[in-house]
């Protein structure tokens, strides 16, 4: 079955949905490479304390914060990353029990640690100019959703580039 790409282009922002896709390291990196992101917030859900992923985050010396609650074996992790660091850690994310992760490009990197506790909807954050892109990957759902600011990205070109990536693939 071929991946399905849907796009909804609005005045100030766009939503792009990619379904029926294998969320492999290669696929995710190819999509990430469509954007010029220097550093970004990487939010990973449902990380276990004993997981290799958590150990690697600490080993790679990445700046991170958690939603750690004493009694829960699972927590969310937000960390500041760049593409090279992401390429090192993506294998551990895909192999972990994490169900979803998101890549968020924020204008004000000083406040990145607050992102984990910020429950404002992504669309509102884009409209307010706080973030310019959010790429959410549902590992178990085999889906990727991208919300982006039209003032910064050419959404029609991004959709064309995504369709070109998957034109001859069966996932």
Residue ranges and their predicted role:
Residues 1-171:
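Structured alpha/beta or helical-core interaction and ligand-binding surfaces enriched in interleaved
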């Amino acid at each position: 079955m071929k991946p399905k790409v849907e796009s909804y282009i609005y005045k100030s922002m766009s939503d792009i949905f990619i379904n029926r896709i294998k969320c492999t390291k290669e696929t995710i990196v190819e999509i990430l490479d469509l954007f010029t992101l220097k550093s970004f917030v990487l939010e990973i859900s449902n990380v276990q304390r004993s997981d290799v992923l958590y150990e690697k985050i600490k080993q790679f010396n990445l700046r991170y914060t958690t939603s750690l609650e004493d009694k829960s074996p699972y927590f969310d992790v937000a960390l500041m990353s760049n593409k090279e660091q992401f390429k090192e850690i993506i294998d551990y994310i895909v192999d972990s029990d994490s169900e979803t992760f998101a890549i968020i490009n924020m204008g004000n990197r000083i406040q990145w640690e607050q992102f984990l506790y910020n429950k404002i909807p992504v669309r509102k954050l884009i409209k307010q100019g706080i973030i310019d892109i959010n790429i959410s990957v549902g590992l178990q759902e085999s889906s990727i959703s991208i919300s982006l600011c039209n003032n910064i990205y050419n959404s029609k070109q991004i959709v064309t580039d995504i369709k070109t990536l998957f034109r001859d693939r069966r996932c």
